[in-house]
């Protein structure tokens, strides 16, 4: 492996990622990590690229073949392909990666979960850091992603009956509006806005996002929570019941499949329509663009 060419290629990655508009800190870090892995893999395969501009379609095929032999999951391979397509756009090389993954014989991704990942019960008082506790509670109550819950500026986001999530706080730089739908959310906002000065996020003034993220990870470890994404799953599942209860004139609603309810295919008539409408709303509220993603949170 040519160290000088590898360093040069890594520098070109840093420069490219640094100048991407609309990407959050986490999205840029993820992009940088994955592109560096691609370049290292290519060097190990004998392609000593010194710059991202040197990427060609044959290199993409080489990477896909390598990932398959390494046993990488379909989801992981598709994630890499999405990053490489973005590189093609940024470098004005639209032919670098073909538009469809079928061209590379990549299997279709399955969104079917094997178990319920929701964290419905946890004692937030076990968190000794008040800012991190607020972040965790916001994930549970509003379905926020980790980065969103840390960068949240409550005084700016809370607009009466809704919470406006700014693009700069989100994955992919796409903002969204969340309606306040219950008293627990409103009580939390009232409590939180009294604790946090106007204009301040849930990051201490003397720390960067990266520094605070490290502290956050230590705190959730002490709470014996390995991954807090389950708080977001819990939000989606509560919201599914809440929405279908609103659609149901009897107020009974539906339990999502992953929590013991009927699958979408088993539902009949109007109940199937409730399921579709609820999934569309939840997909938007979670910051996703595809309804299929809700299978991860709700089952199918």
Model regions: which residues?
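N-terminal core-binding DNA-recognition domain of tyrosine recombinases/integrases
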Residues: 14-107
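A short, glycine-centered helix-capping/turn motif at helix boundaries
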Residues: 138-151, 242-247, 286-289
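Long, amphipathic, Lys/Arg-enriched alpha-helical "connector/arm" segment
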Residues: 100-131, 137-144, 152-155
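C-terminal/domain-terminus segments
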Residues: 54-58, 187-197, 294-300
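Conserved tyrosine-mediated DNA breakage-rejoining catalytic core shared by Y-recombinases
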Residues: 151-191
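Short basic/aromatic active-site micro-motif
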Residues: 224-276, 288
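Active-site/catalytic core of tyrosine-dependent DNA strand-transfer enzymes
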Residues: 181-245
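Short functional hotspots where side chains directly engage DNA or cofactors
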Residues: 163-168, 261-300
